[in-house]
């Protein structure tokens, strides 16, 4: 399975992360991605990454976990396309190990999961 369409949001997600890369490299990767004959992939904003969380299920320290129906459940940290407004050298990441949404320097390397729709 290369992609998965979220029945809750209608968004289509890339199932396999290509690995870790910087934020700028992640943007370029998304622009060049072609899966299932589709080439309109993009790096998701933080709010779209957060839709993968199930806020009704809590675990350690009362943090939500990834939704059960998501086929690529993991605990990795993913870049969003959202720049951190007070510091344009940083962007938001979503850490699925604890559902943290934090800003980090764009020169750091994190995982990428592209979306379309």
Q: Which residue stretches match the model-derived regions?
A:
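An exposed tryptophan-centered "aromatic clamp" motif
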Residues: 27-40, 46-96, 116
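Short, structured beta-strand segments at or near domain termini in extracellular proteins/domains
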Residues: 77, 103-117
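Short, P/G- and charge-enriched loop/turn segments at secondary-structure junctions
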Residues: 98-102
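Extracellular adhesion/carbohydrate-recognition regions
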Residues: 1-41, 111-115
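Generic detector of ordered secondary-structure context
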Residues: 2-5, 71, 106
């Amino acid at each position: 399975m290369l992609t998965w369409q979220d029945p809750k949001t209608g968004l289509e997600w890339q199932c396999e992360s290509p690995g870790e890369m910087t934020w700028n490299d992640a943007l370029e990767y998304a622009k060049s991605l072609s899966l299932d004959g589709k080439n309109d992939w993009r790096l998701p904003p933080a709010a779209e990454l957060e839709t993968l969380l199930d806020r009704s299920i809590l675990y350690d320290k009362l943090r939500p976990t990834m939704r059960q129906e998501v086929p690529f459940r993991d605990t990795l940290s993913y870049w969003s396309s959202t720049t951190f407004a007070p510091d344009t050298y940083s962007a938001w990441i979503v850490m699925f190990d604890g559902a943290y949404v934090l800003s980090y320097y764009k020169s750091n390397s994190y995982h990428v999961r592209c979306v379309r729709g």
